[in-house]
Amino acid sequence: MIAGQPIFILKEGTKRESGKDAMKENIEAAIAISNSVRSSLGPRGMDKMLVDSLGDIVITNDGVTILKEMDVEHPAAKMMVEVSKTQDSFVGDGTTTAVIIAGGLLQQAQGLINQNVHPTVISEGYRMASEEAKRVIDEISTKIGADEKALLLKMAQTSLNSKSASVAKDKLAEISYEAVKSVAELRDGKYYVDFDNIQVVKKQGGAIDDTQLINGIIVDKEKVHPGMPDVVKDAKIALLDAPLEIKKPEFDTNLRIEDPSMIQKFLAQEENMLREMVDKIKSVGANVVITQKGIDDMAQHYLSRAGIYAVRRVKKSDMDKLAKATGASIVSTIDEISSSDLGTAERVEQVKVGEDYMTFVTGCKNPKAVSILVRGETEHVVDEMERSITDSLHVVASALEDGAYAAGGGATAAEIAFRLRSYAQKIGGRQQLAIEKFADAIEEIPRALAENAGLDPIDILLKLRAEHAKGNKTYGINVFTGEIEDMVKNGVIEPIRVGKQAIESATEAAIMILRIDDVIATKSSSSSSNPPKSGSSSESSED
């Protein structure tokens, strides 16, 4: 303020909050996001119905899907949405867990701030606790080999237990395991899984049990000509990034016809060029042609006469998967194709799925890509099935890549909380308070599991703490019986990556929000188009 006059540095209409008010608003917004998904955690969690502005409905209990579909405006709330997206990107599962932990950390931090503990001190304590928690997960984890199918299946089933797809969890877990094993690559003694090699195709109709794994690729296209064979055995597949049609010139052209016979010669030449293309494909031994481009009607006729199965306008991503599955090379020029460019498959056939026809390329001898055909009675069921299978695939892949697992059912969270309280006693200072609050926040996971199962969370937490104090580190909540049991014996296990990434993402988000003490929100562009009236006070300044 100069000579009693305030200095305005922000534009008119700009909203600003600072200090504890800004921090409180950010924390409350983040906690609101956490609470919105809390009731969807675990096998007894509830589903959410999300309706967009067009009236389209999504029914799911998948954390990241719920938050993606929500129209979130508050910046702190958007940061919580990013937590779930990060968890989904790196792990594929545990999105709800990550958001609940982040909300718990912020709720506990609010109490410390009210006791005049500085946010920087809280952040330091949280970071120390996060590192210790991840160390504890590594310490209590159990190694698993790629050949331990039973354990890998249990992990997939644990993931599916909390989904609508749990009714067919045994079959879907088997499909997830086989799909991941088919595309996993062993390099330097470690497995790597590229999810670009796993194609998930959903098709409404049929039952959930009709979902199947295809050792090859599903192309959502039918053959281009009815005269072509429906099935080709011992297929030799040509993949083309070139059209089987006469290329139109890039510039406008006019033909001057002086003699009617010239038209016939012109058409005959076009026909001859198309015949030569088909003859070239036939000469290298191909009996299946799949192209990203178009196929001329005349070329379709010649392909049909040659007994060649053809599909056109296939997506680039599907072409890449076909190349990996069949061993074919994608050829850009038909003149350059050779027999060495062809891929192989035991069978290529047109199959009716629901109301549509699709092309199945199956029986690839050493597939580097596989497909999962997801079926379900309604569109909503199929969509949720796709999300469930995707999570299950990521769980199996994470376990295979990391080679370790930990107990589920809140057991790992309870053990972390128990050990963090002991760890806090060794630290001292105000960071000790933050570490203890971190332990309380981690216990939000078993608390939420108990609440969603209709159990008394206080009784459950007391029993859980008592078991872990006895050294029963794998004891968690059986949400179906309400008892505290050994989760490993019950087959409720999860990859260590799920818990470690959830803690890391939640901690970073909580610290980022705690370090904000000033929120400046500019007015919307619509309001900025209306200039202030003459003589009105302005909060803007010239640069």
UniProtKB/Swiss-Prot annotation:
Entry keyword annotation includes Transport: no
Domain of life: Archaea
Gene Ontology molecular function, alphabetical: ATP binding; ATP hydrolysis activity; ATP-dependent protein folding chaperone; unfolded protein binding
Post-translational events: The N-terminus is blocked.
Chain segments carrying region Disordered: 522-543
UniProt feature, compositional bias: Low complexity: 523-543
PROSITE patterns in the record: TCP1_1, TCP1_2, TCP1_3
Pfam families to which the protein is assigned, alphabetical: Cpn60_TCP1
InterPro entries: Chaperone_TCP-1, Chaperonin_TCP-1_CS, Cpn60/GroEL/TCP-1, GroEL-like_apical_dom_sf, GROEL-like_equatorial_sf, TCP-1-like_intermed_sf, TCP-1_chaperonin, thermosome_alpha
Keywords: ATP-binding, Chaperone, Nucleotide-binding
Biological role stated in the UniProt entry: Molecular chaperone; binds unfolded polypeptides in vitro, and has a weak ATPase activity.
Subunit composition and interactions: Forms a Heterooligomeric complex of two stacked eight-membered rings.
Record family assignment: Belongs to the TCP-1 chaperonin family.
Protein name according to UniProt: Thermosome subunit beta
